[in-house]
UniProtKB/Swiss-Prot annotation:
It comes from the Bacteria. Its EC number is 1.1.1.37. GO terms for biological process: malate metabolic process; tricarboxylic acid cycle. This is Malate dehydrogenase. NAD(+) binds at residues 12-18, 106, 113, 130-132. Belongs to the LDH/MDH superfamily. MDH type 2 family. Substrate binds at residues 93, 99, 132, 163. It catalyses: (S)-malate + NAD(+) = oxaloacetate + NADH + H(+). It comes from Burkholderia lata (strain ATCC 17760 / DSM 23089 / LMG 22485 / NCIMB 9086 / R18194 / 383). SUPFAM superfamilies: LDH C-terminal domain-like (SSF56327), NAD(P)-binding Rossmann-fold domains (SSF51735). Pfam families: Ldh_1_C, Ldh_1_N. InterPro entries: L-lactate/malate_DH, Lactate/malate_DH_C, Lactate/malate_DH_N, Lactate_DH/Glyco_Ohase_4_C, Malate_DH_type2, NAD(P)-bd_dom_sf.
Amino acid sequence: MAKPAKRVAVTGAAGQIAYSLLFRIANGDLLGKDQPVILQLLDLPQAQGAVKGVVMELDDCAFPLLSGVVITDDPKVAFKDADVALLVGARPRSKGMERKDLLSANAEIFTVQGAALNEVASRDVKVLVVGNPANTNAYIAMKSAPDLPKKNFTAMLRLDHNRALSQLAAKSGKPVASIEKLAVWGNHSPTMYPDFRFATAEGESLLKLINDDVWNRDTFIPTVGKRGAAIIEARGLSSAASAANAAIDHVRDWVLGTNGKWVTMGIPSDGSYGIPEDIIYGVPVVCENGEYKRIEGLEIDAFSREKMDGTLAELLEERDGVAHLLKN
């Protein structure tokens, strides 16, 4: 007996990240190889032609799991009964644009989308915000959807997590899949703090294996934090395929579980680790039965506290910068 189709809404559907994302969702990479999906694609009126072109390509792949596609410029149509919502579209920073202008331009988008999710999405909708500034955009959407559980709203730190894994594997000579218990704390921005104090590879402590504080401080942390900028510098375009891959990883693990492995998600704070409630902050979690659970009680040393507070300060500044645009 085939499972009933799940509805997956994707915003910014004509964009580069979506182009790397949609075919993988239709192939079963997001929700499992036995789970049919209906894609509900949202983009601006002027992008509808481009979205139709992408849908022609989706049709031409003849994916067995793709049960249907909706194309729209109306968030209430895109989010109708959505089980998963990937909020990829956001206002990019244009030349000469101040950060506060970027925040308010995105606040406009994410208040509307949060309100639409509140009105029409499944009450169990799993929301992942990919569009930057992702943590604050997720916060805005969450605050604009008072009837949905706060825990439904998450921001993507998985790209930073995967970038950190890759750097640690290269430095230690261990296979990337063998590395466990990595954490990335804070904002999806260069202030984030990738933390491998607890990490192991094949049962060995990575901290002992690498044993290089200078590398950690002067190479590892900045490399992970500035990787996006390095890719733009090298490629002339921002990272799209790796971002799409991280979005798939994030939602797949949230839905299907991590088998006890730590992953990083930006989630609403419950006040632990000195992070004020409701701030969407990257923390290590494990997922099972469709729920994430933060790893609790980790020791925070002085260096980590300083790094965690630094990225928190940026998030608080962003939150305060959009406070006047939010109703609650």
